[in-house]
Amino acid sequence: MALAIGDTAPDFEAETTEGKIHFHDWIGNNWVVLFSHPKDFTPVCTTELGTMARLKPEFDKRGVKIIGLSVDPVDNHKKWAADIKDVVGFAPNYPMIGDTDLNISKLYGMLPASTSGTSEGRTPADNMTVRNVFIIGPDKKVKLVLVYPMTTGRNFDEVLRVIDSLQLTAKHRVATPANWKQGEDVILTGAVTDDEAKKLYPQGWKTPKPYIRVVPQPRQ
């Protein structure tokens, strides 16, 4: 069954390129991006993992840990790293899970629970549903789920934008409008009364419609 926003991210133990982890312990009190790819040594995935490595400093600045996953063995992940660096200029600098028994992929709803066997002999097409992004909060709750098709590489700048929004709205009773970026105006949520808003934003707010109150982004 697919995970939904607000669900507790399932816990698991796994072998990674940086050793064995217990997922919830590994999360600690951090935000986390768990992202999966269909298969090692494939073209789109090569660009994705290299791009994620290039952007890792941006995730670090936000206090976000990143971890990759595929059903390939950890040894394959390690061998593939040189190719990724050759193509993109950056090798994975984050742990990558080897989900060879498919258990985590099934636990997170990326493969049907009825899927049998192991990763051996599986093709990228067999794993076509395993190109997901899960953003998980420090409370271990799922905050966002993205599922991409085989032929479309992910936009990790958008993942960073969503994290900026999630972290801001976790601290302040605001929401972010379409295409919002860090530093731009935000919208007060309905939970904030006008009397409260006057105290929080004495300079006032813009009201293009009675149900829309636009204010400057609060300081984090």
List each model region and its residues.
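Chalcogenol-based redox active-site neighborhoods
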Residues: 1-220
